[in-house]
Amino acid sequence: MIKKIRFYLVRLPIITITIFFCCCVIAALIYPGSHKEIIGYQSDYYSFTHNFLSELGSLKTNTDEINTAIIQKDNTPSMLLFNGGLILIGATLMLFYYNFKKVFAFIEDSSKSIFYSKITMLVGLLAGFFYAGVGLVPHDLHFGAHVFFANFAFLTLFFLCILHSITVYYSNFLNNSYVIGYVAFCIVLFVYLRIIFFGPQIGPGKIYSESDLMLQVIAQKSIVLTFMAAILQQVYGFNVLFKKYHN
C-alpha cells in the first residue's frame, strides 16, 4: 500500500509537472500570435507579458476582438497540448489529495493531523476538479464558464493550502519547514486573488491599458510557477518521509 501512496504523492506529481511544463513550452513555441487592438499590440508569437496562459488553450486566436477584420487563426495544436496538460494537472491534484489523507492514517500520525487531512482531501478534490474544468472549457468556447473555473480554482487552492499547512503542522513525522513553504505560497496566492478579483478586468468588451494587461498576465504566470514550486517542495517532504518509513 505504501508504494501506491508514494506513487501518487511523489512520482506522479513530478511526472505531471514535467509534462505540463513541456506542453506549455511547445504550445507557446507553435502559437500563431495575437492581436489586441485596444492597446495597439500585435505579434506573430506567444508573449510572456501580453498573452494569458488560457490563450494557449483557445480554439482560435483573437476571439476576444470585436473588429471582424482581425484574422482568427486556428490554434488547435497549442490548444490540445495546453488543455491536455491542464486536465492532467487537475486529475493529478485530485489523486494527490485523495491519497494525502491515507498517508497520515497509514503512519498513525496525530489525531489532529488525520482529522485535518480528511478535510484537506475534500477541498483538494474540488480544486482538482476546477483546474480540470479550466482545460475542458477553453475561454473562447464559453468565456463565463472558463473564468468561473479559473477563478474558483485559485480561490479553492487558497483554502487548500491553509488546510494542507495545518495538517503538516500537527504531524509528528513531517518537518514544519514544509509548513513555512506553503504558508509563503498562501501569502503570494492571497495577493494574486486580490489582483484577479479587484484588479483591472481583462476580457471581451472590457476597456484596459497595456499595463493592466501585463499586470494580470505576469501575475498569472508567477502564481502558476510558484504553485509548481510549492507542490515540488511538498513532494520532497513526502519522499523524505517515505524513505525514513521504508528504512
Residue map of PLM features:
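Hydrophobic alpha-helical transmembrane segments of polytopic
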Residues: 9-20, 82-85, 89, 120-127, ...
